[in-house]
UniProtKB/Swiss-Prot annotation:
It is a single-pass membrane protein. The chain crosses the membrane at residues 30-52. It comes from Dictyostelium discoideum. Keywords: Membrane, Transmembrane, Transmembrane helix. GO terms for cellular component: membrane. Its main location: membrane. It is found in: Membrane. This is Putative uncharacterized protein DDB_G0284665.
Length: 56
């Protein structure tokens, strides 16, 4: 009986850990997404400037 209770607690803890991990992963994904957007925008801006400079 005690072993079952321990297993149940372990499963519950494991579940809560995965939920917390998912939240962390989501936060990291949002940060990475924002960084990707900024980098993409920066590259686009630099390329845009270069093409304008080349035309001049």
């Amino acid at each position: 009986m005690t072993e079952e209770v321990c297993l149940m607690n372990f499963k519950d803890n494991e579940h809560s850990v995965t939920l917390n991990d998912l939240k962390k992963v989501k936060e990291e994904a949002i940060k990475i997404g924002i960084i990707c957007v900024i980098i993409t925008w920066a590259i686009f801006s630099i390329n845009h400037h270069h093409t304008i400079s080349a035309k001049d």
